Amino acid sequence: MARRGWGSLKTQRSGRIQASYVNPQDGVRYYALQTYDNKMDAEAWLAGEKRLIEMETWTPPQDRAKKAAASAITLEEYTRKWLVERDLADGTRDLYSGHAERRIYPVLGEVAVTEMTPALVRAWWAGMGRKHPTARRHAYNVLRAVMNTAVEDKLIAENPCRIEQKAADERDVEALTPEELDIVAAEIFEHYRIAAYILAWTSLRFGELIELRRKDIVDDGMTMKLRVRRGASRVGNKIVVGNAKTVRSKRPVTVPPHVAEMIRAHMKDRTKMNKGPEAFLVTTTQGNRLSKSAFTKSLKRGYAKIGRPELRIHDLRAVGATFAAQAGATTKELMARLGHTTPRMAMKYQMASEARDEAIAEAMSKLAKTS
């Protein structure tokens, strides 16, 4: 290796020249990413490296090469690669892909990853408008996650997604009483009426309910448990079945005895077409998976009947959660029953139950005064 004033040149057996130097900042030897067929080009590379160090703008040659290559990678190309390589459930991957296809690629898809800036992100965010706030927020979260990975890959120095999003308004929904639930359920098509009671009293998610099969029911005649392992969701025009939403979502849920009796009767009378272990617990009259649209249609009639047309399917989860809290379930017990990973929602139901308890006490006192 020929010694020089700065850096080294080594002639290889092939006759080509390899250039390298020791960076005084970290004491590490760095090599040119290519060899040269003449000394002049090799020395020019060394001179350029020395100049970067003196100007304090030096970064490792490998990082610069990676960034240069990335300058040709568009956001769409990088995002598609990200979706393939990311450890995501199939349903989540399809969901993220849908947000990217509809809201990210049409506007930002041709922009190079290295050219993504906060100004571009702000313009894209504003251009989506406010008509669909949830979809807008989800698309932004996908873009932010992709850009976080670009930072980790050292393609960009910092994430350009810096918009402060307001948390979605949390709906405070008063849970149905058992009497109101009966009125609502009476309006639901009889073949899948049991769905309302299961959702309400076991606090399952709708996607978990429609993927429940006979093999997921453990029943010794005294105690019934539902083994929640999977969930189904509609992504575009197809139903995607995957593992439950989170690790904690995989759980056994004990069914209140009065609902267990309903389920036993339902299995005897309503699932005659298929009694195998893979048979869905709740189906259409044709034995197919219950759709959200079909269930919602009759559920809305029930909600209107009790003067609560604003309620949604998901609000049925609050029934079982609230009454479990009133029955004395601890935060940890509620988290386990609901399949939550954080205590926030469980504590919300506990607070609701405490508020209800105070109202009951007030009503009791009024009775005493009138007696």
Swiss-Prot record:
Ranges of residues in domain Tyr recombinase: 171-362
GO annotation, biological process: DNA recombination; symbiont entry into host cell; viral genome integration into host DNA
One Pfam family cited in the UniProt record for this chain: Phage_integrase
Keywords assigned by UniProt, alphabetized: DNA integration, DNA recombination, DNA-binding, Hydrolase, Transferase, Viral genome integration, Virus entry into host cell
UniProt xrefs under SUPFAM superfamilies: DNA breaking-rejoining enzymes
One MF annotation (Gene Ontology) recorded for this entry: transferase activity
Active site (UniProt): R205, K245, H314, R317, H340, Y349
Domain Core-binding (CB) stretches: 73-151
PROSITE patterns with a match to the protein in the record: CB, TYR_RECOMBINASE
Stretch forming the signal peptide: none
Enzyme Commission number, as recorded: 2.7.7.-, 3.1.-.-
Xref: InterPro entries: CB, DNA_brk_join_enz, Integrase-like_cat_sf, Integrase_catalytic, Integrase_recombinase_N, Tyrosine_recombinase_XerCD
Transmembrane segments: none
Gene3D superfamilies: 1.10.150.130, Intergrase catalytic core
Record family assignment: Belongs to the 'phage' integrase family.
Function: Integrase is necessary for integration of the phage into the host genome by site-specific recombination. In the presence of host integration host factor (mIHF) forms a specific intasome complex with attP. The intasome subsequently binds attB and forms integration products. mIHF probably stabilizes a sharp bend in the DNA during integration.
Quaternary assembly: Forms a complex with host mIHF and attP DNA (phage attachment site). The complex binds attB (bacterial attachment site) to form products.
Protein name, per record: Integrase
Annotated source species: Mycobacterium phage L5
